[in-house]
């Protein structure tokens, strides 16, 4: 008769090593989950901040006035080497709108307005007033050329609609253009 051999004794050191290896793997999984959670939270906060800034820009900035200024109160200066983007006529990439009414002088007014927005330090109000003057001149020229009040009225309605759009929806494009054209000396971008 064969007597069964006793089960080999496991050394306490080997058991401890296996236990630690298992615990370390779980700790690593938890650390990875914790880091992923933290990253998700950070990205969520960044998205909320981006949406809030976009809403503020769209509505007229923090103070309700659409003004570009450095956060420390210093005056923005023209960005060295900045090249303005080519004017896009009467439209806004922000809203996916591009108007091609076929009136060259209208496109000229819109292009001048785009350039004004991209001139560092130029106020939105000044740019918009120049734009309104340019637009109203188009209608005066139509009246001189055609002499028909019907055409002038249609021109004035179109100009008024375009100008109202710029007044109410132009803050974000203005601020984006100023951010691109200007530099604030004491501001440095920092990532979270």
UniProtKB/Swiss-Prot annotation:
Keywords: Calcium, Cytoplasm, Hydrolase, Lipid degradation, Lipid metabolism, Metal-binding, Secreted, Signal
Annotated GO biological process: arachidonate secretion; lipid catabolic process; phospholipid metabolic process
Cofactor annotation: Ca(2+)
Cofactor binding, note field: Binds 1 Ca(2+) ion per subunit.
Entry-linked InterPro entries: PLA2G12, PLipase_A2_dom_sf, PLipase_A2_His_AS
GO CC annotation terms, alphabetical: cytoplasm; endoplasmic reticulum; extracellular region; Golgi apparatus
Keyword Ribosomal protein part of the UniProt annotation: no
Principal cellular location given in the protein's record: secreted
Signal sequence, start to end: 1-25
Molecular functions (GO terms): calcium ion binding; phospholipase A2 activity
Catalysed conversion reaction: a 1,2-diacyl-sn-glycero-3-phosphocholine + H2O = a 1-acyl-sn-glycero-3-phosphocholine + a fatty acid + H(+)
E.C. number: 3.1.1.4
Active site residues of this protein: 113, 128
Residue sites binding Ca(2+) per the record: 91, 93, 95, 114
Localization, UniProt: Secreted; Cytoplasm
PROSITE patterns: PA2_HIS
Role played: PA2 catalyzes the calcium-dependent hydrolysis of the 2-acyl groups in 3-sn-phosphoglycerides. Does not exhibit detectable activity toward sn-2-arachidonoyl- or linoleoyl-phosphatidylcholine or -phosphatidylethanolamine.
Similarity comment: family membership: Belongs to the phospholipase A2 family.
Protein's name in the database: Group XIIA secretory phospholipase A2
Native organism: Mus musculus
């Amino acid at each position: 008769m064969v007597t069964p051999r006793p089960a080999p004794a496991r050394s306490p050191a080997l058991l401890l090593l296996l236990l630690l290896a298992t615990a370390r793997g779980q700790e690593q999984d938890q650390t990875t989950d914790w880091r992923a959670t933290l990253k998700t939270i950070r990205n969520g906060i960044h998205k909320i901040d981006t949406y809030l800034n976009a809403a503020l820009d769209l509505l007229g900035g923090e103070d309700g006035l659409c003004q570009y200024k450095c956060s420390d109160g210093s005056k923005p200066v023209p960005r060295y080497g900045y090249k303005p983007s080519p004017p896009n006529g009467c439209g806004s990439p922000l809203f996916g709108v591009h108007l091609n009414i076929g009136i060259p002088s209208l496109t000229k007014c819109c292009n001048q307005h785009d350039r004004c927005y991209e001139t560092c330090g130029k106020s939105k109000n000044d740019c918009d007033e120049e734009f309104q003057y340019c637009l109203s001149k188009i209608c005066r020229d139509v009246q001189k050329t055609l002499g028909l009040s019907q055409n002038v009225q249609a021109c004035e309605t179109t100009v008024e609609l375009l100008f109202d759009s710029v007044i109410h929806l132009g803050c974000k494009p203005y601020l984006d253009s100023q951010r691109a054209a200007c530099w604030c000396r004491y501001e440095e971008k920092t990532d979270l």
